[in-house]
Regions:
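Catalytic cores of nucleotide-sugar-dependent glycosyltransferases that transfer UDP/GDP/TDP-activated
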Residues: 1-505, 512-539
Length: 539
């Protein structure tokens, strides 16, 4: 019988997305379903989201959740063809912005909003009329990280929990006095459970209570065990190390495919013929107001403009390389720290028709950026996985990335000290640290490689042919989920056998005949529950 999964998250493309989390949730769910694993996504009913589902309808009412009563809606997203459960409470979710308002300020009740989401997951795990129970609740990031604790404290022993850490830097920290409003049991309001640095910490609760903890790359799984990358939770993570594993993300290779990308219109292309990629560069140059020069090397950046993403380093490194290579251009798409936005926008004044920065993000623009670029610059002080370099590689845009987290796992670079011919086996370039010199040297190295067309073409082919699909990635999740359920089944069978032996012994002592094939009543009830959970969540 297939293991049924309830995926609990704050984002899922295309219904709600601010970054890579939304892409990862959708890609994972689709791949699991394609492999025969029933999976449903539980998501807040943000403004306008319910209208995007086909035949959205109420399946349950949830009373006394944090933030008030809510409805549970079910439906299918027509574009992704994925089943969703939406937690509807307009007082919590019907507003502009997922996490921040129109002025970029965090919603002051974010703790309440996502505590409600975790409580809804626990209620589903416990059982709601007409709604099959999942075998595993898979919580993602701090927004859903209370769910494992709530499931454990509710005594729901036959539903297992997994927490996936997409970014440990965001932990969901809130005042201690909010614990009651968040529905955190009194027994869990201490340093042993949910409190760190005199604040409630949702991520700490998830790490401590989940049956398994995963993160999104092998390198990041090792990094977060250290003080440099553990964001203060490395001690707890080291305690949970036997239950911690890195499972690399995948990408949606249908959505990110230059041969059928609707955002490219008639300029779609494939690895065997890159003629249209050159035309995509012309389109991008025109869009950003750059000189339309087919021989220019166009470096693109598409990310949050923050210190984590080394936007501060890029603002200093790019002018050095622009001065050294007059044929280099830069196109930047992103938003973030206003100071860093200004520093990058200033490059357009210093280098007119060679540099341009567009503040904001839109999906179509991101696709055109990867299609039109020659090189992706993606520095990062820490990077749990790094989806953007993989998108770039799909489009034959060679990435330059920091040697951290997932990029250390996915970008293959023999190194600057190897013979030039060794780069024929590379799919990108890596640099170490967050120094301006390191980034500038990596850019210079890429500009030098561009002068060797056959070598560069080999790197493009390598990048475009590397398999980063969710079908490759999801097998490890499937094995993990199945092992949790099989372990529960084994424990249940052992309990049934023990109960049966005890029953037989008691009957024999009383001189009664016992049919050895008849199990005790309590295990039988457990078996019926298991059978009832064998199908997909209703939609």
């Amino acid at each position: 019988m297939a293991t049924t999964i309830l995926i609990v998250a704050a984002e899922a493309f295309p219904l709600a997305k601010t970054g890579g989390l939304g892409d990862a949730i959708t890609g994972m769910a689709r791949a699991l379903i394609q492999r025969g694993v029933p999976a449903t996504i539980l998501l807040p009913a943000y403004r306008g989201v319910a209208k995007q589902l086909d035949s959205a309808h109420e399946v349950a009412r949830l009373e006394d959740l944090p933030g008030g009563d809510a409805r549970l809606l079910a439906g299918v997203c027509p574009t992704s063809e994925l089943p969703f459960l939406l937690l509807e409470n307009d007082a919590l979710y019907d507003r502009a912005g997922l996490y921040v308002d129109e002025d970029g300020q965090e919603h002051p009740d974010n703790g309440l909003r996502y505590a409600a989401l975790s409580h809804a997951a626990m209620r589903i795990a416990r059982g709601l009329p007409g709604l099959p129970r999942p075998d595993v609740v898979h919580a993602h990031d701090w927004h859903a990280a209370l769910a494992p604790m709530l499931i454990r404290e509710a005594g729901i022993d036959d539903v297992k929990s997994v927490l996936t850490i997409h970014n440990l830097a965001f932990q969901g920290q809130f005042p201690l006095e909010d614990a009651a409003a968040f529905g955190i049991p009194p027994a869990c309001r201490g340093e042993h459970a949910t409190v760190a640095w005199n604040k409630l910490n949702f991520m700490k609760a998830g790490i401590g209570y989940a049956d398994r903890v995963t993160t999104v790359s092998h390198t990041y799984a090792r990094e977060i065990l250290t003080p440099d990358f553990g964001c203060g939770l490395d001690g707890l993570l080291r305690e949970r190390a036997p239950d911690l594993m890195g499972i690399p993300n995948g990408i949606d290779t249908v959505l990110w495919d230059p041969s059928r990308d609707r955002h490219l219109g008639s300029l779609q292309y494939h690895s065997g013929d890159l003629a249209n990629k050159r035309l995509c560069k012309t389109v991008l140059q025109r869009e950003f107001g750059l000189l339309q020069d087919p021989n220019a090397t166009l470096v693109v950046m598409g990310s949050r403009l923050t210190e984590q993403k080394m936007a501060d380093v890029a603002a200093e490194a790019l002018p050095r390389v622009l001065e050294a290579y007059p044929d280099m251009q830069v196109a930047i798409l992103g938003q973030g720290d206003r100071r860093l936005e200004g520093a990058l926008k200033a490059l357009a004044v210093q280098y007119p028709q060679r540099c341009a920065t567009r503040i904001g993000y839109n999906e179509a623009g991101a696709h055109r950026l990867h299609a039109g670029g020659d090189i992706l610059l993606h520095g990062s002080r820490f990077e749990p996985f790094g989806l953007t370099p993989l998108y770039a590689m799909r489009y034959g845009t060679v990435p330059i990335g920091s040697r951290v987290g997932g990029m250390a796992d996915t970008i293959e670079d023999p190194g600057a000290d190897t013979p030039l011919t060794a780069m024929a086996f590379a799919n990108g370039l890596l640099f170490d640290g967050d120094h301006v010199d390191a980034m500038a040297n990596a850019l210079s190295r890429a500009m030098h490689l561009r002068k060797h067309p056959m070598l560069w073409r080999a790197m493009q082919r390598n990048a475009m042919s590397t398999d980063f699909s969710w079908q490759r990635a999801v097998g490890a999740y499937e094995e993990l989920l199945a092992s949790l359920v099989s372990r529960e089944d084994a424990a249940q069978e052992q309990g049934e056998a023990l109960s049966q032996r005890h029953g037989q012994a008691r009957a024999q002592a009383q001189g009664k005949a016992i049919d050895a094939a008849t199990p005790a009543a309590e295990p039988a009830r457990n078996r019926r529950t298991r059978q009832a959970r064998g199908s997909m969540m209703p939609v």
